[in-house]
C-alpha cells in the first residue's frame, strides 16, 4: 500500500503556478482572481481565506468582494458582469453555497466561460463531456494530477465513482472516461453497490458519508481515492473511506486530511494561471 500524498503534489503544483505567475508579471501581465462571498457563513469564510492566502503565496492577485446576506440576485449578477468586462481579472469565483433567495445556476451561467476557473459553466461542462479543451472543476482535476504524479495510468481500468454531484462525481467520471477508463457512476439509488465496488480497479468516493466505503467493498490491490471530508462528533476529520480497514487492501490510497483536499485549491490556482496565459496570448504578449 502506498499513500497518495496530496500535500506534496499540491506544493509542486503551487511552485509551478508561482513560476508561471512570475513569467507573466515579467511580460506585463498580473494574474488576478476575483472571489465573491455573499453572507457570513463561517465555513465559506474559512475556504475563501484559504484561497486568498494561496493566491498571495503563488503570485496571483486576489480581489475580494464581500457582500451582505441581503444582496439581491440582480446586484450579484451586476457585479459579475462588471468583473466579466474587467480585462485585469482572469478568474471569477463565487463561493458556494449562496443564500436561498439567489438562483445558483443563474449566477454560475453569468460568469464568462473563459473566466470560469471553477469549471461550472455549462459551456465548460459540455467541453469536458465532449473531450474538448475548457476549464475543469478543481477537485476532479486535482485527482487526475495526483494519479499522474504517481505514474498511475487509468486506461483500461474499471473505475467506480461513488456520487453524482456536478462538482465532483459527474466531472470525475468524464475525466476518467476521457482517459480511457471504463467508468461506472453509483449513487443513492444504485443497487448492488458492494458488488459493483468489489470489481473496481479504481474507486473514487465522493458521497459525503463518513467511513462509507468499508473493506468488504474493496478488492485487493485497488486504487482508492477519498474525496470526503467529514467531521465526527468527537472532532476528528475522516473521509468517505474507512481508511484503517481499507488501506491494507489497496495498492494506492489518499488519506484524509492531506489527500484530495489540498489539490482543490492548487488546481484553482492552476486554472487561474491558465486563464492569465490565455489573456497574454490574446494580447500577443506570449506565444504559448
UniProtKB/Swiss-Prot annotation:
- Reactions mediated catalytically: (6R)-5,10-methylene-5,6,7,8-tetrahydrofolate + NADP(+) = (6R)-5,10-methenyltetrahydrofolate + NADPH; (6R)-5,10-methenyltetrahydrofolate + H2O = (6R)-10-formyltetrahydrofolate + H(+)
Protein known as: Bifunctional protein FolD
Pathway(s) annotated for this protein in UniProt:
One-carbon metabolism; tetrahydrofolate interconversion
HAMAP family recorded for this chain?
Answer: THF_DHG_CYH (MF_01576)
Q: Pfam families recorded for this chain?
A: THF_DHG_CYH, THF_DHG_CYH_C
Biological process (GO), any one: L-histidine biosynthetic process
Which Gene3D superfamilies does the annotation name?
A: Leucine Dehydrogenase, chain A, domain 1 (3.40.50.10860), NAD(P)-binding Rossmann-like Domain (3.40.50.720)
The family annotation for this protein states: Belongs to the tetrahydrofolate dehydrogenase/cyclohydrolase family.
Write the record's keywords in alphabetical order, separated by commas. Answer: Amino-acid biosynthesis, Histidine biosynthesis, Hydrolase, Methionine biosynthesis, Multifunctional enzyme, NADP, One-carbon metabolism, Oxidoreductase, Purine biosynthesis
Record-listed E.C. numbers: 1.5.1.5, 3.5.4.9
